[in-house]
Every structure is written in C-alpha cells, then in structure tokens.
Amino acid sequence: MEHMKKIIILLISLIALSCSKNDDDFIGSIETDINFMPVEIYNNSNISENPGLKLKLITREEFPCYNYSLITTQSIEDNELIIRLEKISVPTICLTAIGPATSYIDLPEKINKITFINGNTIDQYSITINQEKISINIIDNNFTHLLFNQTFRYPHNSFAYVSGTNTDNTEIYEQFLEVLKENPNLTEFDFEREGRIPYPTTSDGHWVNHPSKYFQYTDYKEFENLKSILKNFSRENIEENSGVSISIYGWDNISYHSWLSN
C-alpha cells in the first residue's frame, strides 16, 4: 500500500512538472506573425518638434477592437536592440473597428542589429541608420516580416506639397506648384533611389489625386510665409465645395491647409 502511495505521488509530481513546462512555453510569446518598419513620428499635433525615430510593430492578425496593443520588453546590448514579444493586451475601452495590435519602440541611431524573440524563436536583422535613410536587411526571419528595406527620413528644412482636385479644375494643382517653383527661397528636390518616403506621396479621396512635390528652404521664416501665401491663393482660386484641397506638410510637424484658409 505504501509502495502504491509513492507511485501515485511520483505520477502527480511528473504531471505537475509537465504542466508547468507547457505553461512556460507560452509565457512571453504571441501566436501571430508581425509586420514591422521604421517610422518617424511626433508626440503632439501641429506643434513644431523634431520627429522621433521609432520601430512600428503591427500584428498580421486582426482583432475585434482597433486599439489592441502589442506588449513588448526591450533592451540594448552592444548596439543590438533586443525586442521580446510578451502578449497582446486587450483595451479597457474598445474602439469598435477591426484592426491589428500595434506597438512603437524607440529606435536609437547607434543600433546596428535588431533581434526579435518570440518564445523560443529568434529573428534577426542588420540595420544601418544615417541622416538620409534607414536600411534594414534580413539575417534570419521566421515570424517577423520587414515591410520596407529602405526608409527615407524627413530631410531637415523640408516640406511636401500635397494636392487633390476635381476632374474639371486640375489646373489649380499646377498653378500653386508654379507659385512654389517661382519662389527663389525654395528649392524643389526628389527622394533619390528606392525607399519608402515619409511624406504622403499623393493626396487621398479626390477625383484626381496628384503626385506630391517636395521642397527645401534655408530660412524658417520662408516656410512660415507659406501660410499666408496659401491663404491668399485659396481665397482667389479655390471655390467652396469644388473638390480641391492643398496641404503643406513640414518636416517639423507644422502643416497648412487650404480648407482652413478660404
């Protein structure tokens, strides 16, 4: 009888250890693949500030609420950014739209390697960061997916001209573009070679969405003057409800819009 008790106790112990081991396999891991890309974002709305460099993580799986969060922990060792995927966090208040869980992680400029850890699986990437762009290359990937190998950064003292029109007034786009080109204090430029451009590349939601154009200035006052230039142009050339919009997006988070002018 005593011998049977010992056997039963041993079996219970083995089952408990087995359950404990299986539970540990799911601690600090998630079950969905991850898309990611570097981004430059701002902390405030339309307040002048330099953009902060982040790594944006997006789950491939979509959830019932748009504001699910991807919880991570991270550390830096010898210029290597190590990111551990912990769990998907359910929000207290649900924003009722289906969407992925997301997370933004600080991306220091000294980093030259990124490591993702999901349970017992490890993905790694090399990364090069300079003032012009961020370049990322795969070393080994299993559950993570890089959206863009090359990502341009916001050039200092730059802005984007973004405009959309109706089909019968497309000339307004060209007219304001000429205003910008004729300004001796502004220089048009292009993002050379391949890479994701941080500015909107076209307008959105118009009958005609024109390609964006990019300019740089040497004196910030010249950029500030664009507010009144756009205001005057809009009053003289854009009719209300004509389906035309013009926006100026500055690299420092300041923007001007025609619909706030006319």
Role assignments for model-derived ranges:
Residues 59, 85-89, 118-120, 129-131:
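A mature extracytoplasmic/lumenal domain signature
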Residues 85-109, 209, 215-230:
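An anionic, turn-rich surface loop/hairpin at beta-sheet edges
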Residues 110-121:
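A short tyrosine-centered beta-strand micro-motif
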Residues 180-186, 190-262:
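Preference for solvent-exposed, low-hydrophobicity sequence contexts
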